[in-house]
């Protein structure tokens, strides 16, 4: 499984998401938070959590670094910035997908089936066969030619339609598999995020306990 930082880099590097990634890195650095580690965890929360749960999850991540008075406002700022970026990115991706399918259909419609080239030897063989069956009337021969032409046209049209529909279906299936893979990867990363948040909370609690002991020790000396 890819490391969280690699997953974050892959997602934040796409389209307008890159702008959000740059903004988030700068914001975390200004707050004194390790952006190389926590940008990935924050991204996982923004992608996977429900809207009403995003703020709580972000507060759980950043509470080890921020004062309680400013924690909520900063988390709201991150969520709002993410929502604005995702609205733009989603619109662009949908337009790109529609354009890709339209282009594929257009290309398939332009495919021209080359007519079969009949060699001189085949022509001679056909002429010999016709000579053996001289009782075949001109009317029957003309009717057969018309039937053959109609059947060929129908077959070519059917083949084109089938080829075009198959390719469009392949494109849609490939995109679905890609989305499923990203969703599974995000779910695994989300579980890692929760473990990391628990570690951060314990570390914060330990720091508070140590600070409390130092304060009490100083008071006893006085």
Swiss-Prot record:
Q: Looking at the keywords, is Phosphoprotein present?
A: yes
Give the lineage: Eukaryota, Metazoa, Chordata, Craniata, Vertebrata
As recorded in UniProt, coiled-coil segments are 119-143, 175-217
Q: Which domain of life is it from?
A: Eukaryota
InterPro entries hit by this protein: CCDC43 (IPR037666)
| Region entry Disordered, spans | 136-222
User: What is one term from the GO cellular component aspect held by the record?
Assistant: cytosol
Q: Which family does it belong to?
A: Belongs to the CCDC43 family.
Fetch the PANTHER family from UniProt. Answer: COILED-COIL DOMAIN-CONTAINING PROTEIN 43 (PTHR31684:SF2)
Q: Keywords assigned by UniProt?
A: Coiled coil, Isopeptide bond, Phosphoprotein, Ubl conjugation
Instruction: Locate the compositionally biased regions of type Polar residues.
Output: 152-168
Q: Where is the composition biased (Basic and acidic residues)?
A: 172-209
Q: Where is the composition biased (Basic residues)?
A: 210-222
Locate the cross-link: Glycyl lysine isopeptide (Lys-Gly) (interchain with G-Cter in SUMO1).
Answer: 93
Q: What is this protein called?
A: Coiled-coil domain-containing protein 43
PTM sites of type Phosphothreonine: 137
């Amino acid at each position: 499984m890819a490391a969280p930082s690699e997953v974050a880099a892959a997602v934040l590097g796409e389209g307008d998401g890159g702008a959000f990634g740059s903004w988030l890195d700068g914001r975390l650095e200004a707050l004194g938070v390790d952006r190389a580690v926590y940008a990935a965890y924050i991204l996982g929360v923004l992608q996977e959590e429900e809207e009403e749960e995003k703020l709580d999850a972000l507060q759980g991540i950043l509470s080890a670094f921020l004062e309680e008075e400013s924690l909520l406002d900063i988390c709201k700022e991150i969520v709002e910035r993410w929502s604005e970026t995702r609205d733009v990115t989603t619109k662009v991706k949908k337009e790109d997908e529609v354009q890709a399918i339209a282009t594929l259909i257009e290309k398939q419609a332009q495919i021209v089936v080359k007519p079969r080239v009949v060699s001189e030897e085949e022509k001679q063989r056909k002429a010999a066969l016709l000579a053996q069956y001289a009782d075949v009337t001109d009317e029957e021969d003309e009717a057969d030619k018309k039937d053959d032409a109609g059947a060929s046209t129908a077959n070519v049209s059917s083949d084109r339609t089938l080829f075009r529909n198959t390719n469009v279906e392949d494109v849609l299936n490939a995109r679905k598999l890609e989305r499923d893979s990203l969703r599974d990867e995000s779910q695994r990363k989300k579980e890692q995020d929760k473990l990391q948040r628990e570690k951060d909370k314990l570390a914060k609690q330990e720091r508070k306990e140590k600070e409390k002991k130092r304060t009490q020790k100083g008071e006893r000396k006085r």
